Amino acid sequence: MATIMDFLLRQGLNVPVGYSSVGSQSTSSSSTSIPMDSSLRNVDYLPEIDITETKDSLIIECELAGVLKEDISIEVAESKLIIKGDKKRYAYRRPNQSWSYDDKNQISQSSKISEQSSGADQWQHSNDPNVDSQSNLNMPSSKQDPNVQQSRVGNVPESKVNRNDTTEPNLPSQPFQSDMNPSSSSSSIEKQQIPNVSHPSFQQWSGQPQPQQQQQQQQQQQQQQQQQQQQQQQPFEQQSQQQSNLNDPMQRQDSKEISQPSELQRSNFGESSVNQPSSSSSSLLGSDNSQSNVDLPSSRSVEPQRPNVSDSDTNQGYSQSVEQRLGNTQQQSSQLPQQQQQQQDQPRSNVNEPSFQQWSSQQDQHRSNVNDPSSQQWSSQPSEQQQKSNISESNVSQPSSTQFVENIPSNLEQLPQQEQQRSNGNEPSSQPWSSQPSEQQRSNINEPPSQQWSSKQDQQRSNVNDPSSQQWSSRPSEQQQQQQKPNIGELNVNQASSDVCSGPSVSETRKQFEENYLNEQQRQPQQQDLSSLHKDEKKPSSSSVSQTAQLFEPNKREEQRKDKPEEKKFDSDIIKSSEPTNVESIENKDWIQQKPQEQQQEPREISSTETSNLQQPMERQINTETPKEQQVSPQQQQPQQQQQPQQQQQPQQQQPQPQQQQQERKYISERTFGHFKRTMDLSKMLYRLNLREEVQTHFVNGLLIIILNKKPFEPSIKIPVN
């Protein structure tokens, strides 16, 4: 005990102490042990320690101004109580005092280091050979804009490009170099030209690994001649991929061509995707945003972008099948410059033309399988690769989609194209116009009429890029049904989200769930025990089903109590929160009458925290029950019957304590020293326990209670400490 007192003293906690002393001897503050027959008189420096010495026990209470951490070793040797604590770990503090110990200092210093380092590079590139060049790249932008520094975990190159373009839009030929430190510009370019394919932080930037991107770009170029719609998508995707991957060797050759439309880059990255890894979907959304509705960046940047992060962008590279990617391995890098120059102006010039709308109608397809040829050709039969990828897509994307039910922006009228690009993906925000689909989508995909579309909406949402589902067949394809069988988690997710979108509202489904749950709860106890029904024959027959269900809970409780003594506290809360009817008083009567007998039959081992937790809520429950029940009780018979069990409660509740506490003697609860914040308002009850040679320690409501008894066990007396 003295060691705790010593380092409390060194903390400067000079709170005066009240204590009752019986005895003459006192020990100096530097001693490491306390003779048991002495009471401490020189404890003025301690924070509120009560030391109570009775005939057979010494009770020490410390009220600690802080948090008591885990490991305090307590030994009893030859009538001496020795408490040892490591001062560095216990960081006690006054309310206005900052943490001042070693581990805390290390934490604060490390956080300062991470703030001073360039943005998120410390975390992103811990294993990266290019750390130096990349941190040099990012230093200026992190100094310019602290917001970018915080939000840019996966985005380092994008925000870098974006900052330069927005601040210097008139320098089209310098999108990348102007942000570099001049000393490191040449070396960093050389390093960046070597694609660091396998590095994980690189994959975090781009949302998908590099070799797949190159091959997917080649696949796109092969399809370029087939469909004019794709011609508009490709330059955006390639630009965003190349800007997000500074390591692409193509990108250095074409930097001038990429940098010409500074509006495109600004719209791609400035508004929409500062906060997320770049993906072709975000760049498509962003460019659409700047060109068709320039005045709506706020709704764009706040709401729609979150699902894209958890959409299959992160999944996509991994879920695409190997045979798709390995089919087209020949390099077509010679086409890149012309292709980009050809098509950079098309999306801007075609904003309001049908081809642009065709592009937007396929946006959901892009979101999950951005560069997948089979999904863009709308083949009538789903490839195996898509069946594979869709399973993972729906798992990833569904949970995030439910967050957006209430966030549908108010300016929907102004956002028809953008919102539908988003909503045709995995979000339930597509519901408002599910009954009347936009002309763009119907005309371009050659769907049947709109009723089939809205009725198949959950099908569309769970399999965004399944070609068979996008042909809107009137019955779900077999591939979908197969897809939902193997993966149970996905099936649950899809069902829940389809309820949100096309079925009843969230509150209705929740009501339905609660009703089902209550019905099950009511069925189970009746099967368990019908015998206790006879106890309720005195009661009026008008009691509801839920009340009769509560009748049987004592039987459940007793089963639980045999295994988990901690459940008592929870049960008392259940009693309070459930309808306060006369049923509860019967419940308590049965429960209390059976309680001492059980304890005699089965000695249990309860840790000291559990006893201190058990006894307080039960006594508090006695007080809170009577007013509630008398207010609610419809008949006058009930209060009279209620008072009888409560009179029985109080004597019977104190009797089982000796039995519980006798079993506690062998166990010092190690869990008592946890992180408990001090709460002054709760009642402090001390139970004198006999532990013979061992010490019982409590940490209850901010009190450290250390009790050591000298004599064999006697029936316990409650010692209230004020």
From Swiss-Prot:
Compositionally biased tracts (Basic and acidic residues): 554-576
Region (Disordered): 99-666
Low complexity bias (residue ranges): 106-118, 203-244, 272-292, 330-347, 374-389, 428-443, 468-484, 634-662
KW DNA repair (keyword) present: no
Gene3D superfamilies per UniProt: 2.60.40.790
Domain of life: Eukaryota
Keywords, comma-separated and alphabetical: Stress response
Biased composition annotated in UniProt, kind: Polar residues: 119-153, 167-182, 189-202, 258-271, 293-329, 348-363, 390-427, 444-467, 492-507, 541-550, 608-633
Residues covered by the sHSP domain: 40-179
Similarity section: Belongs to the small heat shock protein (HSP20) family.
Record-given protein name: Heat shock protein DDB_G0288861
Organism: Dictyostelium discoideum (Social amoeba)
